[in-house]
Amino acid sequence: MKRSRMKTVFFDIDTQIDFVYPSGALYVPGAEHILPVVGQLNRHAPFLISTMDAHSQDDPEFQIYPHHCVVGTTGQRKPAITLLNDPRQFILEKQQLDCFSSPRLEPLLAQLDADRYVVYGVVTEICVRCAAFGLLKTGKPVEIVTDAVKALDEQKAREMFAEFTAAGGQLTTSNRYSPT
């Protein structure tokens, strides 16, 4: 398979209406404030994988969390600021917390053959965590953009950041990826 020229792959994790707006079914308080940063990162991304929860009406996850991101609802959609309308953005729907549960992700990563991953979105200590730690298993550098994530539990997020850096991950800010 031919190697893609893209070396860095950005991951926009679950920035969906149900999570990022106060009217959302599973709102993460303050998440709307990261949207401008997420939008900027997405526009700068050489290649972007945007994950989306895509639940059925009777999804088993609703035994743990309230109904959210049901396929076809407004809440499942991504805010316009996060969309590129560009072939650099790949939308990856998933039914579980971990984006690696999607059978489409690992073949895509193999095809892209990235040298580095940049991760941001919601929820820091849940789905962002799953993505970041899953990507660390590739053996490639992984960064979490700390001003482009939002947590439900700030203490758990701090613990996750400590665990992540101890495992070899890096923390950064969006300034690193600001256009010059």
Where are the language model's segments positioned?
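A generic "structured core" feature
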Residues: A131, K156-E159
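Histidine-anchored nucleotide/phosphate-binding helix
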Residues: V37-L41, I126-G139
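Internal catalytic-core helix/loop-beta-alpha segment
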Residues: G72-E125
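Cofactor-binding loop segments of dinucleotide-utilizing enzymes, especially the Rossmann-like FAD-
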Residues: I13, D53, V122-T124, D147
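Short, charged, surface-exposed secondary-structure boundary motifs
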Residues: S102-P103, L152-K156
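A short glycine-rich beta-strand->turn/loop micro-motif centered on a GG-aromatic cluster
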Residues: V118-G121, P141-E154
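Active-site acidic carboxylates
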Residues: M1-I91, R158-Y177
